Amino acid sequence: MIRRHIWWILLIACLALGLLWPRLGHRDQVIPVPCQDIVAGCALSPAGLRVRFDRQPDALQRFKVYVELPNVPEVHASFNMRGMEMGFNRYRLLTDGAGRWQGEVMLPACIQGRKDWLMMVEADGVRYEIPFNSR
């Protein structure tokens, strides 16, 4: 009887570990990218990253994001603010096959009226954090 209880405990422990493993595993590396003018473009030379917008973004208005990042299979972009999650807004950017990625995106509305945004560009297990301001 005790042996049976031990097997159940081990089974439950294995299931719990399986469910928690993704949260315990490796965290994506976050690299800050300094950016003065997101429309002119911002770059991080060692990674080969360059990011720019087609215009100064405004909440709930579509704009284009352009990312240059060679040798990665996928690029995703999302938008948040420091200390404030802005809901699910993750975009998969499309490539031209030469390390250039683009997508049409939209900033969520901030009910506090803040304009200080963080764009997260995710590629190949690395997250690049790019600060910018909206109108």
State the predicted function of each range.
Residues 97-106:
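Aromatic sugar-binding surface patches on proteins
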Residues 46-96:
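Extracytoplasmic/periplasmic/luminal assembly and interaction segments
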Residues 49, 89-91, 101, 126-130:
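Short beta-strand segments
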Residues 4-23:
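Hydrophobic membrane-insertion alpha-helices, especially the h-region
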